[in-house]
């Protein structure tokens, strides 16, 4: 039998994972890594990671008065670091795997483009991407949408939606397993879209494969990722173009 995506992820160095998120300040995709500045997360988002989680933790980070300075450790825990878990002498929840449980999110497969559109430029788009690396996408209750290679099962991309950030600290809570909550619980789907300006008859088609994901039971929100070229674009340096948008209830 082949290895599971969880076992492959557990054998991966957390620092090598490509994980991106949405920066509320600049309103763009950014690497999900701690920084002393607001380069990757806004100050409000960073404050969410300094919350001590318990049964009273709310999604409004500002209303939580029990805080500490373990934000960087919590973010690294979410990335997969295990050195602060209880079994290692730390205070964070023990995990059986870095990959969280998947409950209601259905797997979505994306290989070569297969739609038979007769629109301008689409046939070239299909030819250009006929050898595209096949990826399966699925949401998890570790706070991420995952993209796994169907070739070897390795994680190629993970996305943390803005709507999950206020509650991510709960994943470090030792009592989380008895107080489970959903995060990225919705099912992703994709479609091929011409994103060019078609107001001119001389426009140049710009076809992309766009993924739409939702939080499902994890909240009211959706996000859009450009998953056209996994091998070229699934890097943290391209987070700004990879994440097209991320909207939650009452967000701007």
Question: What does each model-found stretch correspond to?
Answer:
Residues 1-252:
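A fold-level detector for beta-propeller and closely related beta-sheet-rich head/sensor domains
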């Amino acid at each position: 039998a082949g290895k599971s995506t969880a076992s492959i992820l557990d054998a991966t160095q957390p620092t090598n994972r490509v994980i991106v998120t949405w920066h509320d300040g600049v309103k763009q995709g950014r690497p999900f890594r701690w920084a002393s500045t607001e380069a990757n997360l806004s100050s409000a988002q960073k404050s969410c990671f300094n919350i001590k989680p318990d049964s009273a933790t709310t999604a409004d980070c500002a209303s939580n008065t029990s805080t500490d300075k373990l934000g960087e450790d919590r973010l690294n825990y979410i990335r997969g670091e295990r050195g602060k878990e209880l079994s290692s002498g730390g205070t964070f929840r023990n995990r059986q795997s870095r990959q969280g449980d998947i409950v209601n999110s259905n797997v979505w497969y994306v290989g070569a483009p297969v739609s038979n559109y007769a629109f301008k430029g689409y046939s070239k788009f299909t030819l250009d991407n006929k050898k595209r690396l096949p990826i399966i996408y699925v949401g998890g209750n570790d706070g991420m949408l995952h993209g796994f290679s169907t070739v070897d099962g390795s994680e190629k991309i993970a996305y943390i939606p803005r709507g999950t950030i206020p509650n991510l600290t709960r994943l470090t809570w030792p009592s989380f397993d008895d107080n489970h909550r959903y995060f990225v619980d919705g099912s992703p789907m994709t479609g091929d879209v011409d994103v060019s300006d078609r107001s001119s008859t001389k426009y140049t088609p710009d076809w992309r494969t766009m993924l739409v994901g939702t939080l499902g039971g994890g909240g009211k929100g959706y996000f859009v990722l450009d998953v056209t070229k996994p091998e070229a674009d699934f890097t943290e340096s391209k987070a700004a173009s990879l994440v097209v948008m991320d909207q939650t209830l009452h967000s701007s």
